[in-house]
Swiss-Prot record:
Its main location: cytoplasm. GO terms for molecular function: acetyl-CoA C-acetyltransferase activity; metal ion binding. CoA binds at residues 237, 258. InterPro entries: Thiolase, Thiolase-like, Thiolase_acyl_enz_int_AS, Thiolase_AS, Thiolase_C, Thiolase_CS, Thiolase_N. It is found in: Cytoplasm; Peroxisome. It comes from Arabidopsis thaliana (Mouse-ear cress). It comes from the Eukaryota. Pfam families: Thiolase_C, Thiolase_N. It catalyses: 2 acetyl-CoA = acetoacetyl-CoA + CoA. Expressed in root tips, emerging leaves, young leaves, stems, and anthers at the microspore stage. Its EC number is 2.3.1.9. This is Acetyl-CoA acetyltransferase 2.
Length: 403
């Protein structure tokens, strides 16, 4: 691990600490905690691991998608809850599923521009705590029944342009690239198997900050330190699930889509100059990044546009990339992008992904960067790329160089 002047230039963006909570299942182990609390836990742990005093932080940029009823300025709540001073600037980012990664990109840009030297970035989501809305109540509910709007569906999982769920877009992708139900189920089973193997080998231990959850009413509190989704795997059952979005000939199911979940992830970024000055251990550098967008209903394959942009921005060739994390919004997303980019399956999501681990919307973009860092460390890789699609037709991608 290097923090020598030869390997780090003054304006390099250096990752010096990372942490994430376990991914809690929908209405599961972490559902008693708001996203902001999960965010605080991840930030505090990342700073502690980085050996960076919270008082040195100049800015916090944090992703969050389902902000209704979280209270004002969620990123600020997460930061102050982690002991970061009142004088620190905080901004919440909403780029749907790419929020956590976009937050890291914005933080990196501020370091490259010389505006900041120490920034905390990441993302958080508690899908379990997303409220349902009485959308018409403010105008006066004069007569008859009122209907509830599901905030999670409306603001997180619905294509407003075509008035359909994200899963319907996944079906469109499966149709376009001729990806069968069996292929998607095989991929989903592989995601669980890889995730379980990684968990058993302790590959996630260095990523995770254990979360203490109050038992309430005098009952003892429990410690949550494992990704909850991995404990619910049943391959035979997964293959028998009914399609969720298309009755006739549908291929996308609850089993081969990402699971609704709760979690937070944080990264501490510093300039090369600051890393040398403070004698910090540099885990990796951010080499490049890129965003892309296309038709909203084809958000599924936007990573295939963003990933080459990020690799080019890093001044690399795709042949130099050792490992990829492509967020598994749906099994079909990982399969289609692998196909479009010509990537060998053994280089992608080697520790499982959102299908098995969970996909807390605002968190996932940051979570996959932390997982990617662990994979590069464990498998002696040098360059890794994280890519994540987002609702509305977009995607973000980022290149890491392990030191």
């Amino acid at each position: 691990m290097a923090h020598t002047s030869e390997s780090v230039n003054p304006r390099d963006v250096c990752i010096v600490g990372v942490a994430r909570t376990p991914m809690g299942g929908f209405l599961g182990s972490l559902s008693s905690l708001p996203a902001t609390k999960l965010g605080s836990l991840a930030i505090a742990a990342a700073l502690k691991r980085a050996n960076v005093d919270p008082a040195l932080v100049q800015e916090v940029v944090f992703g969050n998608v389902l902000s209704a009823n979280l209270g004002q300025a969620p990123a600020r709540q997460a930061a102050l809850g982690a002991g970061i001073p009142n004088s620190v600037i905080c901004t919440t980012v909403n780029k749907v599923c790419a929020s956590g990664m976009k937050a890291v990109m914005i933080a990196a840009q501020s370091i490259q521009l010389g505006i900041n030297d120490v920034v905390v970035a990441g993302g958080m989501e508690s899908m379990s705590n997303t409220p349902k809305y009485l959308a018409e109540a403010r105008k006066g509910s004069r007569f008859g029944h009122d209907s509830l709007v599901d905030g999670m569906l409306k603001d997180g999982l619905w294509d407003v342009y075509n008035d359909c769920g994200m899963g319907s877009c996944a079906e469109l992708c499966a149709e376009k690239f001729q990806i069968t139900r069996e292929q998607q189920d095989d991929y989903a089973v592989q995601s669980f198997e890889r995730g379980i193997a990684a968990q058993e080998a302790g590959a996630f231990t260095w990523e995770i900050v254990p979360v203490e959850v109050s038992g309430g009413r005098g009952r003892p509190s429990t410690i949550v330190d494992k990704d909850e989704g991995l404990g619910k795997f049943d391959a035979a059952k997964l293959r028998k699930l009914r399609p969720s979005f298309k009755e006739n000939g549908g291929t996308v199911t609850a089993g081969n889509a990402s699971s609704i979940s709760d979690g937070a992830a944080a990264l501490v970024l510093v300039s090369g100059e600051k890393a040398l000055q403070l004698g910090l251990l540099v885990l990796a550098k951010i080499k490049g990044y890129g965003d892309a967008a296309q038709e909203p209903e084809f958000f599924t394959t936007a990573p295939a546009l963003a990933i080459p942009k990020a690799i080019a921005h890093a001044g690399l060739e795709s042949s130099q990339v050792d490992y990829y994390e492509i967020n598994e919004a749906f099994a079909v997303v990982a399969l289609a992008n692998q196909k479009l980019l010509g990537i060998a399956p053994e280089k992608v999501n080697v520790n499982g992904g959102a299908v098995s681990l969970g996909h807390p919307l605002g968190c996932s973009g940051a979570r996959i960067l932390i997982t990617l860092l662990g994979i590069l460390k464990k498998r002696n890789g040098k360059y890794g790329v994280g890519g994540v699609c987002n609702g509305g037709g977009g995607a973000s991608a980022l290149v890491l160089e392990l030191l």
